[in-house]
Amino acid sequence: MLSCRLQCALAALCIVLALGGVTGAPSDPRLRQFLQKSLAAATGKQELAKYFLAELLSEPNQTENDALEPEDLPQAAEQDEMRLELQRSANSNPAMAPRERKAGCKNFFWKTFTSC
């Protein structure tokens, strides 16, 4: 009984010392500065990529438009659709995109049916 109490007391003492050592550890300002720079660089790269994509999509290809013949019209429509889709994907947030629901579709999730 005494050895069990002693083991519990030693375990509690070790936990208290470990927590005290972690909270009392000095924070490294270089690490904090590095993390801030990396976060700023990541958002800057993402904004730069969106800017270049928008610029690329907004440039008209004059040589293709001037030499457009009637049989090329369906291909031009497809290119316009692809361009619009790329613009939508660049402007929209993929994490916030709403899911399309189908009529009468049901999913089985955790013992219940939910509509898709």
Curated annotation (Swiss-Prot):
Mod. after translation: C-terminal amidation of the neuronostatin peptide is required for its biological activity, including for the regulation of mean arterial pressure.
Cellular compartments annotated: Secreted
One Pfam family from the record: Somatostatin
Positions of modified residues (Threonine amide): T43
Coiled-coil parts of chain: none
Cysteine disulfide links: C105-C116
Keyword Secreted carried by entry: yes
Superkingdom to which the source organism belongs: Eukaryota
A GO BP annotation: response to acidic pH
Tissue-wise expression: In the pancreas, somatostatin is expressed in delta cells of the islets of Langerhans. In the stomach, it is expressed in parietal cells of oxyntic mucosa and in the small intestine, it is found in the villus (at protein level). Neuronostatin is expressed in the pancreas in delta cells of the islets of Langerhans, as well as in the stomach, in parietal cells of oxyntic mucosa and in the small intestine, in the villus (at protein level).
InterPro entries per record: Somatostatin, Somatostatin/Cortistatin_C
Assigned keywords, A-Z: Amidation, Cleavage on pair of basic residues, Disulfide bond, Hormone, Secreted, Signal
Signal peptide: 1-24
GO molecular function, one term: receptor ligand activity
Family that this chain belongs to: Belongs to the somatostatin family.
Protein name, as recorded: Somatostatin
Organism: Mus musculus (Mouse)
